[in-house]
C-alpha cells in the first residue's frame, strides 16, 4: 500500500528536470556549451526542446589594455621606433596603422588589434622597443549592456564541430602580411602558407593575388611603341657632396641601429671566411646595343630596363652549370646545402645604409619579369619599406658598385653564401677586333670573391667565363633559356 501511494503521488506531481545552458567567455568571443534539456514524466520518458529563452548580458569591455609588440619573426627581438602614426587621445580601429618599426632586417608597420582610444605611448622616436614588451596602452571600446535571446538549437554533430574548430585555428602571419592581404581584400584563411608551421609569407599573398588577377602585362603592339628621340650625350660632372656640418662643441655619440646593426653582425661573421678574388674584363658592346633596342619596349610596358636583369639572368644560367656557387655552408663548414632556388641579392645604397634585397627564383623568371621585380625592390628600398621576405633567403649576390663609380672592388661574402660579384662602371675604351682593327668597346670589369674552403679558383674561373660569354653574346642566352 505504501508503494502504491508513492506511485500515485509521483503520477500526480510529475517531476520536471531542466538542465540549463551555461556560458563561458574566452577573450571577447562567447562560446555556448549546451547541457541536456529534458523532461521526466510518468509513465514515459521523452526528450523535448525547451520553450523558453535564456537571456544574458554582454560583457563590458571598456578597459585599458596593454598592446604588446608581437613576434615579428626571423629571430628579431628588438626594433627601432621610426614613426608614430597615432598620438595619445587618438581613436583607432582594428587594422589601423600604429607605428613603423625597423629591425636589423626590415621595416614593418604595426597595426592595431583593437577598437579604442590611445592612452599612452611607451616609446619616443628612435627608441629601442623589445618583442613582448608593451608598445601602447589602449582603452577598448565598451559594449553597451544588452540582453540577447539565446535560441535553443539541436546538438551539433561531431563532424560539424570539428570543422568549426579547424576554421577557428589561428592564422600565422606578420602584421605587414595581414595588412597586404587586407589592402587586396584577400582572406588569409584562403591562402596556403609556405613558411614555418604554415606561416603565411608575403610571397604567398603575391602568388595568390597573381593567380586571381594575373601579374604580367601583355606585350604592347609594335605600332603603339614610340621610341623616345636620342638625347645628346653631354659631358657629366660629379655632383659635389655637401660637407657635413662642423661641430665645434662636444663629440656626439649615437647608437648603432637598424641596417647598420645588421652590417655589424654580417661583416663580423664574414671575417671568418677565407676569401679569394678573381677579376675579369667583359665587352658589353653587343649587350649595350640590345638594351637600347629593348628600352622603349619595356618603357611602353611601364618598366625601366637597366643592365641588371641581364646580369642576373646570365648569372642564373651559370649557376645551373655550377650549383656549388649557389650553395650555403653551416657555421662550422661541416655541411654544404645546395639551394634549388636562385635568390640573387642586389646590393643597394640607400639613405638608411647598405641593404641587400634579393630577386626570388631568377631561374624561372624572364628578363622582363626580373626587371619588374628590380623596379619594385628599388622603390621600396629607397623609401625604407622593404619587408623581411625581400631581405632574407639570398643564395648569391651581385653588387653594382659601378653605378656610383669605380672599376674594381673587393666584395665581402654575405654568410652563409659562398660567392659574390662586384660590377664596375661601363666605360667606352679602345679595343682590337679579330682583324686587328681598333674599335670603340663598352668595357665593364667584374671582381669575384668566393669562399676558398669550398670553392677553388678553377670553378670560379669557369663560371665567370660562362657568365661572360652570355653577356658578350646575348643571343647565346636564348639557347639555354627555359
Curated annotation (Swiss-Prot):
- Might you report a single GO cellular component term? mitochondrial nucleoid
Is Transferase tagged as a keyword?
A: yes
User: Where does the record place it?
Assistant: Mitochondrion matrix
Q: What is this protein called?
A: Lipoamide acyltransferase component of branched-chain alpha-keto acid dehydrogenase complex, mitochondrial
Q: Which residues are in the Peripheral subunit-binding (PSBD) domain? A: 172-209
Q: Which residues carry this modification: N6-succinyllysine?
A: 133, 196, 261, 289, 440
The function of this protein is: The branched-chain alpha-keto dehydrogenase complex catalyzes the overall conversion of alpha-keto acids to acyl-CoA and CO(2). It contains multiple copies of three enzymatic components: branched-chain alpha-keto acid decarboxylase (E1), lipoamide acyltransferase (E2) and lipoamide dehydrogenase (E3). Within this complex, the catalytic function of this enzyme is to accept, and to transfer to coenzyme A, acyl groups that are generated by the branched-chain alpha-keto acid decarboxylase component.
Q: Which Gene3D superfamilies match?
A: 2.40.50.100, Chloramphenicol acetyltransferase-like domain (3.30.559.10), E3-binding domain (4.10.320.10)
| Residue numbers spanned by region Critical for association with PPM1K | 145-160
| Keyword list, A-Z | Acetylation, Acyltransferase, Lipoyl, Mitochondrion, Phosphoprotein, Transferase, Transit peptide
Q: Where does CoA bind?
A: 291, 306, 349, 378, 399-400, 403, 424, 426
What cofactor is needed? (R)-lipoate
Region ranges (Disordered):
217-252
Q: What is the lineage of its organism?
A: Eukaryota, Metazoa, Chordata, Craniata, Vertebrata
Q: Which Pfam families match?
A: 2-oxoacid_dh, Biotin_lipoyl, E3_binding
Q: Give the UniProt record's GO annotations in the biological process aspect.
A: branched-chain amino acid catabolic process
Amino acid at each position: 500500500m505504501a508503494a502504491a501511494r508513492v506511485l500515485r503521488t509521483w503520477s500526480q506531481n510529475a517531476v520536471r528536470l531542466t538542465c540549463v545552458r551555461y556560458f563561458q567567455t574566452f577573450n571577447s568571443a562567447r562560446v555556448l556549451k549546451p547541457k541536456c534539456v529534458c523532461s521526466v514524466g510518468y509513465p514515459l520518458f521523452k526528450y523535448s526542446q525547451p520553450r523558453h529563452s535564456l537571456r544574458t548580458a554582454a560583457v563590458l569591455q571598456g578597459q585599458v589594455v596593454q598592446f604588446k609588440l608581437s613576434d615579428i619573426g626571423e629571430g628579431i627581438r628588438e626594433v627601432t621606433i621610426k614613426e608614430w602614426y597615432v598620438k595619445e587621445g587618438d581613436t583607432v580601429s582594428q587594422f589601423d596603422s600604429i607605428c613603423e618599426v625597423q629591425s636589423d632586417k626590415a621595416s614593418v608597420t604595426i597595426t592595431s588589434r583593437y577598437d579604442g582610444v590611445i592612452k599612452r605611448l611607451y616609446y619616443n622616436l628612435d627608441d629601442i622597443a623589445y618583442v613582448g614588451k608593451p608598445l601602447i596602452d589602449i582603452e577598448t571600446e565598451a559594449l553597451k549592456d544588452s540582453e540577447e535571446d539565446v535560441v535553443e538549437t539541436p546538438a551539433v554533430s561531431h563532424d560539424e564541430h570539428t570543422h568549426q574548430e579547424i576554421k577557428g585555428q589561428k592564422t600565422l602571419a606578420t602584421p605587414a602580411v595581414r595588412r597586404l592581404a587586407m589592402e587586396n581584400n584577400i582572406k588569409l584563411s584562403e591562402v596556403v602558407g609556405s613558411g614555418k608551421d604554415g606561416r603565411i609569407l608575403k610571397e604567398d599573398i603575391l602568388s595568390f593575388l597573381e593567380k586571381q588577377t594575373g601579374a604580367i602585362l601583355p606585350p604592347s603592339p609594335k605600332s603603339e611603341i614610340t621610341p623616345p628621340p636620342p638625347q645628346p650625350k653631354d659631358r657629366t660632372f660629379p655632383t659635389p657632396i655637401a660637407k657635413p656640418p662642423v661641430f665645434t662643441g662636444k663629440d656626439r655619440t649615437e647608437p648603432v641601429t637598424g641596417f647598420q646593426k645588421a652590417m655589424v653582425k654580417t661583416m663580423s661573421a664574414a671575417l671568418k671566411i677565407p676569401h679569394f678574388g678573381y677579376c675579369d674584363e667583359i665587352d658589353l658592346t653587343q649587350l649595350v646595343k640590345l638594351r637600347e633596342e629593348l628600352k622603349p619596349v619595356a618603357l611602353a610596358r611601364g618598366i625601366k630596363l637597366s643592365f641588371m636583369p641581364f646580369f642576373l639572368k646570365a648569372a642564373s644560367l651559370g649557376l645551373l652549370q655550377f650549383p656549388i656557387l649557389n650553395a650555403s655552408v653551416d657555421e662550422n663548414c661541416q655541411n654544404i646545402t645546395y639551394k634549388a632556388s636562385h635568390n640573387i641579392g642586389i646590393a643597394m645604397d640607400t639613405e638608411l645604409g647598405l641593404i641587400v634585397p634579393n630577386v626570388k627564383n631568377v631561374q624561372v623568371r624572364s628578363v622582363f619579369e626580373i626587371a619588374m621585380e628590380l623596379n619594385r625592390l628599388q622603390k621600396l628600398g629607397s623609401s625604407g619599406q622593404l619587408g623581411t621576405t625581400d631581405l632574407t633567403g639570398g643564395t648569391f649576390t651581385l653588387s653594382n658598385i659601378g653605378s656610383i663609380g669605380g672599376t674594381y672592388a673587393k666584395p665581402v661574402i654575405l654568410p652563409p653564401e659562398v660567392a659574390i660579384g662586384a660590377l664596375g662602371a661601363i666605360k667606352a675604351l679602345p679595343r682590337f677586333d679579330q682583324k686587328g682593327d681598333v674599335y670603340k668597346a663598352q668595357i665593364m670589369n667584374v671582381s669575384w670573391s668566393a669562399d676558398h674552403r669550398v670553392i677553388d679558383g678553377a670553378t670560379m674561373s669557369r663560371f665567370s667565363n660562362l657568365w661572360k660569354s652570355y653577356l658578350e653574346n646575348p643571343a647565346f642566352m636564348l639557347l639555354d633559356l627555359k
